[in-house]
């Protein structure tokens, strides 16, 4: 579960920290209030493309840190240990980008390649945007969902059927 998001010198935000409560959280506000900036910052800390354009005017760099409670995500803890990263109940993801475009990613204080952050994010977060339900209208979507739900068991059954 996402516990907090801390954003420093990102776009128009000098310093902002959002603490999340367990359950459902909602960002609301008028146009221009900064909701999209927070969503963009969250994407960056999860491994999305980070442009130097996000560095706040007058700053040398920005950083974004997200803290997750991973006590109920044992497969993530196993992955972290495989990567040589100490796995505790709190997971700290941090991404820093300089005005020159240099990026640095850390997990629990250990510098990692961006690919590690992206892999971790797939085990933690599922982000859905506006109109993404349209993907369900594609012909292959229902089959993909059934295959994903069935997992390896479905693939084994299909292989056995094809062998007959």
Residue ranges of model-derived segments:
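Gly/Lys-enriched N-terminal cap/neck module of very large, oligomeric protein machines
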Residues: 4-145, 149-164
């Amino acid at each position: 579960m996402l516990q907090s998001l801390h954003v420093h010198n990102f776009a128009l935000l000098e310093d902002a920290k959002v603490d999340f409560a367990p359950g459902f959280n909602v960002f609301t506000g008028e146009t221009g209030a900064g909701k999209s900036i927070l969503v963009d910052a969250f994407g960056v800390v999860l491994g999305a493309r980070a442009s130097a354009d996000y560095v706040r005017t007058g700053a040398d760099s920005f950083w974004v840190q997200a803290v997750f409670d991973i006590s109920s995500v044992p497969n993530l803890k196993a992955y972290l240990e495989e990567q040589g990263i100490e796995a505790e109940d709190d997971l700290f993801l941090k991404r820093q980008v300089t005005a020159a475009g240099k990026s640095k990613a850390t997990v629990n204080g250990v510098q990692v390649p961006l690919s590690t952050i992206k892999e971790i994010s797939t085990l933690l977060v599922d982000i859905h945007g506006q109109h993404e339900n349209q993907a369900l209208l594609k012909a292959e979507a229902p089959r993909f969902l059934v295959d994903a739900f069935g997992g390896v068991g479905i693939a084994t059954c299909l292989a056995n059927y094809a062998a007959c």
